[in-house]
């Protein structure tokens, strides 16, 4: 923005191409032609980086070159062609401005004094046409600083330390067309400071400290086309005709200021304005007639402000508008007919806006719309006539499939099958393992039921992925708002929280039995049943509470296609964010810490009790087995929960997380415990392994009998005794005759528990 060649390059790159003869081909709604051939492709295959048409037509014209790039084409192309031709013809390497200051360079009538340690404007020949004084130490521009330079056309004063500009500093610069004052410390410009600059076309005052302006500030700028006031400290614009003395102004840029509202009279005289940029301000209110007189406006950028409400007729008079950006505003509601008058609109940006009442009717009048940008890719289904809709995916789903990745589509079934089969198998086999501690068995059965719900959740997600295969964009938003999605999300959270609480309870039970074997702390039947009921009730409350208060939680489970609320920040509800943090960084994190501490204490306690044992080598071996088992339990918990803790913490501090992470967490990380708990707590335990060995032994015995026909097989009971924990075993069974001392009994008790892990 600081030189002509830059804008010329932007113009060349941003040229607009039409679609050729594509309009001659008739395609169904949601599909678009492949250039001048009769082939049609759906919206999702256009501008995806792949030549799906075969003639590259689906990848042509994908750039959004509407708005300011077209204005460069219209207003500056011919000018640069003419000036560049003249400069080539007249170019010479000889210096024609006489003597120049030290550290300065001269060529033809151009003076380059960049980084020359200047503290004032140098004095050179009056015929100089270009003067660049960038990166110096000029602090003030006194009166008549440039008065003798009548032929000066371009003046660059960027990156100095200018604080004060005299009202007559630019007097006499009747030929000046471009003035750059960017990156200085200017706080105020007096009325009439540009009075003599009748030919000035570009005025760039970017990155200064201007706090106020008035129409008189720009008095005399009759030829001004481009005015850039980016990144200043303006808090308001005058409620007077700002363009009163700039009748030819086409481009006005106020990006990065602190403007709070736009008044009705501010732009009343800006009849020729084609580009208005107001992004990154603090605008929270728009008067309904603020843009009424901008009937030639081609681009309006109101992005990244604090606008909550759009007046119904705010865009009514913008008949020529081709690009509109209202993204990243906390807009509460967009009227169905909000864009009805924007028939020429080609690009619409609605990123970062939750459109609760979205429908096709909103965008149907926008017959020329070629690019649209949403917060959620699911909204693209409501603009099927728009060729380029972004984003194409949220990292989990795509316009085509609920699960975007083929790996996820396959493994959702694999993980679901493993989880369901493993837990159902344990539930079915548990009655055949007669546990001396029925309360422990009851807890394990309850854990399997909770883990099985995770498998059901994954199964349903896989089923709906199959149902929507190839046309998910049509069903995306209704699916995420549906009762099915809300219920399955609740089921996943119920499974997760009940599993977490049950694992914590089982761990504390083991901890008490091993570390305090002779204290009366063991839960009885009524107490255990009460704890299990309490855990399930708590899980139901945590999981289903968001469904009971939509105003507080918004669409808590419907922020993504898999219906899991890992990133509750997407809901736009502070309450939902706090609730999610309490669950993932409160309940679950505390539970994980308790489990790690308890298993560490258990291992230490068993290790201390076996130091005095006579069979040291046996005890060391048993300790190693115990250590491995404890490590595996803690490791699987850590593998499941630590990534979730990290992701939740990063999202809480607003660190950008790749969109694809959520789906991988839900399908591969979250079900780890649900899939492995049956293995850890049943299938690898000593009673179960002994039962399997006994079944194999019986099978071999029967085969032997069948072969011999005479020998009768010994067939023990199919029911096996589970040896751990030994809470309900009789005293006679627990206490050997050789030990009568409580300390020795403690050793035996702990050793018995140690044996049960092997």
UniProtKB/Swiss-Prot annotation:
> What is this protein's tissue specificity according to the annotation?
Detected in brain cortex, and at low levels in testis.
Quote the record's binding site residues for Ca(2+).
Answer: 45, 48, 50, 52, 58-59
State the Gene3D superfamilies in the record. Low-density Lipoprotein Receptor, Rhodopsin 7-helix transmembrane proteins, Ribonuclease Inhibitor
Q: Which SMART domains does the annotation name?
A: LDLa, LRR_SD22, LRR_TYP
Q: Where in the cell is it found?
A: Cell membrane
The glycosylation sites are: 36, 127, 264, 272, 325, 368
**Disulfide cross-links:** 27-40, 34-53, 47-62, 485-563
Listed under subunit, the entry gives: Interacts with C1QTNF8.
Gene name on record? Rxfp1
Extracellular membrane side:
1-408, 465-486, 549-577, 651-660
Which species does this protein come from? Rattus norvegicus
Name of this protein: Relaxin receptor 1
